[in-house]
Amino acid sequence: VTIVERAPQPHPNRRSLLRGAALGVGALAAGAAVGPLSAARAGASPTALSGKTAVVVGSGFGGAVAALRLGQAGVRTTVLERGRRWPVNPDGTTFCTINEPDGRSAWFADHPPINQLTRLQSIARYPGLIDRVYGNGIDAIYGVGVGGGSLAFGAFTPQPRRKDFATVFPAQIDYDELDRTYYPRAKKMLGTSPLPADLLANPAYRGARAWLDYIEDFGGEPVLHDFCVDWDVVREELAGRTPASYSIGEGPYGSNSGAKNSVDRNYLPAAEATGNVTILPLHEVIEIREISGQDRFEVVVKRIDESGAVREHKTLVADYVFMAAGSYYTSALLATAKAKGTLTRLNDHVGKGYGNNGDFLIARGLLRRDCGAKQGGPGVAVMYDDDNPDGPISMSWEASPFPDIAGGSNMANLIQVISDERGSIDYNPATGRAELNYPFGESSSDVDARGRSFAGRFHERTETRFGSPATGIPIYTRLSDFGSGCTWHGLGGMVMGRACSHEGQVDGYSNLFVVDGALLPGSSAMVNPALTITAVAERCMDRFVAARS
């Protein structure tokens, strides 16, 4: 075991800095977003935290925010990421595709993690992009690599409505403050914007136009929202000047064109540019323990190679630890630490309150409208139905690269509800590992029941009512990875106001924090959670720095 003293060196990368500037990720007023170029200057300013050390576990949305803000505060910070870096190659071969997966698709697995048409295919074991956690009652999808979930998410960054937010989040999280400060900051840093009108009019985006027509058929109103996409790159795709990705429905396995504004293209380069942050890929945290008599931690890590072989064990000592390994892994590490007695002050809420964000995925086939097979995406708008008999509901369209043989009459939609159903991440002494438990079967789940009901209602109002009852019949069986059997948006496990404070400080510790989706209360209020995770992490880091300045 090696005791590692962190002495991060600056990693200014001219190309990434110039790209950040070109994206307009510049400095705003005090407390607002700071882009890569100005971040290097901000990181040089001494604060009361200067010279302190921190470990950030994970490099997704929350971890990237923590890394940047710690670096700017002068904290010598090490970011531990179990996955590899994924630099986008100009030849378009960085990532595999949905219909032709290989080892790059999955985190050391024998089969691809998503897409039922390829799930039985054999692949080489490799530190690939997606880790599918097989739970008891639900599976959960997590992105792995420098950039975490931002590498694999669908690039949806909607902001929840105020009334839905108030239903889910505790009153201590002020929506007005998020709306005024932290949502705009997150949007600026991530480079989010709605689907532009010229792309919506493009033939490749007929699926998006069909979705807007279906919303009108239903009697709803489309709510256009932001996506974490560089639309100029998508225009280059359509012009044939860069490899096609979002223009043909790709994205979950990464964007070969570089159109996805994942955090390895904004927050993380800015963090490295402060000179205080070092990112260590292929470093997996296996244990966190308090140091007796000290207000510090030891973080035990194994460094692996791309075959999965362990090359080295390390123990890092830090003044502060920020957990951002994804809701399952953050919760699993802490639940394990509690069970093994390496973190003795954790409370009984650790691992509890895990929700699937109210997600209910459906496919609609043989539609009466042409949607295209390789659908330009990633989306366009969300529809709300506040008059739904089973309670308010939202529904979005997710562009997909359906096989050409399937024709252009298919559509994937995500229905979202607000539900109290919660599972847990629990340490199992029989296996020596944490596991995901979600005791809501397909026949007993509130999310499934409401999702099925609305899917039928939507079909009646958009197909049957127009004289076409045999078209657009929804598919939602869990056996096909639809319904609520597998979530991309697992949230909770270290819930604010229970296992943690509303600022992310873990109960029982003054120097241990959670800044990822584990902190959210099992839901992000009927929208995809990436933007809210980022905004809440920004709020947490502002509070952290201010309290120690």
Residue ranges and their predicted role:
Residues 281-295:
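A conserved short coil-to-beta-strand element within the FAD-binding core of flavoproteins
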